[in-house]
């Protein structure tokens, strides 16, 4: 018999590693759906950020893992309802970090191949 997310979360909060693994396994399809939706909606395949859906799924797993200790079943909320924003936010954090790293790599090269760092207006103007 499959245990509920709320019961598995309560066990995981008490230190049961097997319950945490089961909780992640029970929600793999949801995490995969969120990752695929985000990958398509942000057009990450064409972005040049070197991210794929597996990266987003891994970030989603971490988001779910971080939501476990903060979940309070006494508030009457289902675990996945509580964890969904944490899962999506973890994926968005990964995309933001990848974009920031991509921006830092952007340079302008002249005809001699000399590279100059990108300069923003706020760095030049008073």
Where are these regions (language model features)?
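Charged, low-cysteine interdomain linkers and short loop/connector segments
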Residues: 95-96, 100-126
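Alpha-helical promoter-recognition and RNA polymerase-docking modules of transcription initiation factors
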Residues: 1-103
């Amino acid at each position: 018999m499959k245990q509920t997310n709320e019961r598995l979360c309560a066990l995981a909060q008490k230190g049961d590693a097997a319950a945490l693994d089961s909780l992640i396994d029970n929600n793999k399809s949801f995490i995969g759906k969120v990752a695929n939706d985000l990958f398509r909606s942000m057009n990450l395949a064409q972005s040049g950020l070197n991210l794929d859906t597996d990266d987003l799924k891994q970030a989603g797993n971490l988001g779910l893992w971080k939501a476990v200790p903060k979940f309070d079943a006494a508030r009457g909320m289902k675990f996945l309802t509580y964890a969904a924003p944490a899962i999506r936010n973890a994926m968005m954090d990964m995309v933001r970090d990848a974009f920031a790293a991509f921006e830092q790599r952007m340079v302008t090269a002249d005809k001699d191949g000399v590279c100059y760092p990108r300069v923003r207006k706020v760095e030049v103007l008073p």
